[in-house]
Amino acid sequence: PPDGIMVEIDGKPVCAGGLYIGVGTKFAFMEWIVTDKDANPRDTHKCLKKCIDSIMNMAKSKGMKLVYTATKEQALHKRYTKYHDMVLTESNVKTFLRDLDGSYSEDLTWISDDEQIDNLNK
């Protein structure tokens, strides 16, 4: 993403996330909320709060009125509604991608879930 936040403890990244801005709109997309799986869970919780709150503040500072995100991670579903005042708007979302020039289609594992990777390998 063009804009983003990384939260560290003692110089070690704990979590990060990005923000895409819809140019000419008041709409932003928060994406790629990732964590260090080896980090202490309490540290991860605190850092995620800071990261997501910072992304929301970044969106506000850029004049955005809406921030949208999508995730299959149940822990993030709960976090978004409990700690970040987000509203669940869709429950059964499937994501789609079109490679416009053919340069990315050879390996889509970086953006695919395990089920889709298994389907590609059949």
Residue ranges and their predicted role:
Residues A28-D85, E90-S91:
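Acyl-donor binding region in acyl/amide transferases
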Residues D10-G11, D38, D99-S103:
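Short loop segments at secondary-structure junctions
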Residues P1-D10, V14-T35:
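A conserved beta-strand-loop-helix scaffold within acyl/acetyltransferase catalytic domains
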Residues K12, D53, N57, S61, ...:
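Polar/charged alpha-helical tracts
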Residues M6, A70-K72, D99:
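Histidine- and aromatic-rich ligand-binding microenvironments
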